Amino acid sequence: MRTSQYLLSTLKETPADAEVISHQLMLRAGMIRKLASGLYTWLPTGVRVLKKVENIVREEMNNAGAIEVSMPVVQPADLWQESGRWEQYGPELLRFVDRGERPFVLGPTHEEVITDLIRNELSSYKQLPLNFYQIQTKFRDEVRPRFGVMRSREFLMKDAYSFHTSQESLQETYDAMYAAYSKIFSRMGLDFRAVQADTGSIGGSASHEFQVLAQSGEDDVVFSDTSDYAANIELAEAIAPKEPRAAATQEMTLVDTPNAKTIAELVEQFNLPIEKTVKTLLVKAVEGSSFPQVALLVRGDHELNEVKAEKLPQVASPLTFATEEEIRAVVKAGPGSLGPVNMPIPVVIDRTVAAMSDFAAGANIDGKHYFGINWDRDVATPEVADIRNVVAGDPSPDGQGRLLIKRGIEVGHIFQLGTKYSEALKASVQGEDGRNQILTMGCYGIGVTRVVAAAIEQNYDERGIVWPDAIAPFQVAILPMNMHKSFRVQELAEKLYSELRAQGIEVLLDDRKERPGVMFADMELIGIPHTIVLGDRNLDNDDIEYKYRRNGEKQLIKTGDIVEYLVKQIKG
């Protein structure tokens, strides 16, 4: 490709509305342009990267035995009504009617469509297992699209769905998809972790997320410094302290704390160690309970894990925190003065709280706290559960090492769905025993457009993008200095361009009448891994300057050796 016949569209300045580095660099490198909130046009450089990602995904899915299909983005509402998700899905589901007043949706996912297809196409267990995938546009009407293509409304996704007659068969395909995803992200040159995850609204019995590690990530990824243990922070177990609870050394005293409405204020004003404080959060109880709320207690420096809390049988789902008005109606005190002593509703305490002694907590009286509280002396030990987020340094749940926490960007997610959708849509086949058998399902997603942004978040410097070789828009840039004035530079540039292309290498020849500084800046901005610079001075010695984008190292290579050298660097 020649720049004179290409839309490069680079920008010198960073657009003001671009928050994260991937959004900034995708705009500056001429990869995308915003059409409307959460909607982007992909320009030629962006499409080239997108196709590289797609091709790797497609190759590994095919290698894993998955079969490619293509399903419509527009889906009839009756399928969503049949599955129950018409009511369950929020405003992210874009609903509309056609000219015949028939309701439809723009698909955010395709479980209903694929299950409808399978219930009409398959009849016998002998046809299974099967795993279907597509690379297709999705639409989710995000309330606040942000971070460019990282959280856009329209995006490209690889979604796969497998069908089975047994859990054992599902597990085999699940393991194959886990391995395929690991190959996909490894081939792309990404630093990632596969982590245990909560199944969330999708449901099912098992789930793993594939997280690209990056400072800008929205998720906390937890992993052991010693073993292979890794989990999303929502799922990571906080192990109970091994040390027995220390004996009481203080009497419980009621203390006036009129200006301490938060743990931070309590600690500062009374010079308390934060590890000796407990915070109490009230959430709504499950419908039909004899009590309106449940009190959840975690140590002052810990955070409540809302996913774990929501799984408590006495807690309503979705998890809903009580308002101040609701709290006062039950406890007769505000949210800054709550604690376990004389709490009139059920209490659940975190494992760490159960091991505490001589601690401070609200007295359930406005402006007052109890200091020196001890379990079983001042208040009975209530139900104990793991309800907090882990913190760095906690013991790993597998008993090996300590936990580290890094930020991650979710680029893939695999689920064992079970029979949730097949039961709702009555998808079954004749089993081996001749009886009707509901199908067991798995689903497996990769955010293709998100992968592009995540790769940039992990691979950039002050000059621009530093693409991993496998997904770079071009492999080699040829920069001929003053080619329009120097015949030998022009002749060599054309010769190398032809020879490299004949070797199957993707080349961008910068044949613009531009200053060298502009040419260098553009090639570094768009992140082409290998650059060769042709100039009369070096050619006097039969040399060509080669530069590797990732480390910035330069070297002189003889003109007769440069093609072989580049082929070796790129193809190994």
Swiss-Prot record:
Keywords: Aminoacyl-tRNA synthetase, ATP-binding, Cytoplasm, Ligase, Nucleotide-binding, Protein biosynthesis. Changing residue 378 to A: Little change in both the aminoacylation and the editing activities. Pfam families: HGTP_anticodon, tRNA-synt_2b, tRNA_edit. Its main location: cytoplasm. It is an enzyme of class 6 (ligase). Changing residue 443 to G: 150-fold decrease in posttransfer editing activity against alanine, without change neither in pretransfer editing nor in aminoacylation. Homodimer. This is Proline--tRNA ligase. It comes from Escherichia coli (strain K12). The gene is proS.
